[in-house]
Amino acid sequence: MAKRERTTKVDAPKRRVYLQRADELMDSVADAEARSHAIAAGVAAVQAAIAVADAVTVARLGLRSTGPDHEAAVALLGRCGAKGAEDHAKQLKRVLAVKNLLEYEDRLPTEHEARDVVERAKRLYAWARPFLEP
């Protein structure tokens, strides 16, 4: 049996709420990087990627993921109709794959893992940001 996609309807103008979250979290990424705090940068990058994906899906579909594992966020982003959305949904999936490591596991991320999640989140944010402007 296929999993039911867990989403909620959100009015498109509310994209600004999710965009502001993403903007502030990306600022936190830069601050953490400047202090060589790789874990903090990675955690903020994951949260920024989720927020910017929500902003895109709210803007394009009027929907936001509410699933606990963020699978719906990846699926929604992939089908939102924006140019490059499928590729960027894959980026989001890769970012989310590192979330548990950064936040919960009993080992620290490698330098490569920490840097990779930040770079992927930055690419997702840079792709999404221009078409989310008011």
Which residues are covered by each model-predicted region?
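Terminal alpha-helical segments
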Residues: 1-134
